[in-house]
Amino acid sequence: MKDRTFKAIIGSDNPLETARVLLAPYNMQTLNTKVNACTLCSSKNSKEMSYGNPNANILIITDYATDIQEYKDLFKDLLNRSNIVQSDIFITPSVRCICKRSDNEYRLPSYTELKNCKQYTDFTIDFVKPDVIISMGATALNQFIPDNVNFLENVEKDTYYKGIFTLITYSVRDIFNFRKLNEPTDDKIDHIINILNKAQKYVNNKE
């Protein structure tokens, strides 16, 4: 699989795509600078930045931001257990603020926080322009599907957003929540890995 940057600069006859590729690293820096300085939400919590290859074929929109190391470790483990090419992914949280109550306990993001962060999600999609999006968890899904849609009814479905093939799966936070309820999680973990593999296969088949 050739790198998109190489293909756009060396083998592309589309000047707009070449310009997008060349500007992508700058746009990633712009995104994180804007997020870090963002004061749209009254909470003004600490934030989680987007990272990865800004010219990736695969964009992963994760659940709302976290600073819990166990979550980060499981996410990395799932990537390692899949066939996904990790140099070809860009990862962005659906809500960048780490949402905590006044007592420092974690909470769900508010509708306003979700709405305020949507502009950053859309900006990310536009500058990465991936071949496929992986949406992990209900918060990510609500960035581009109305929030009255039931997540569990959509988790097995494929869709399109801005004309981009989009796969829906569970989030790492979902796995930990199911464990707290003493519910089995092997099938959910398998689903995430299968979705990662499906995204990579989709990219490979486009080559």
Predicted regions and their residues:
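A polyanion-binding, active-site-adjacent surface
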Residues: K2-E207
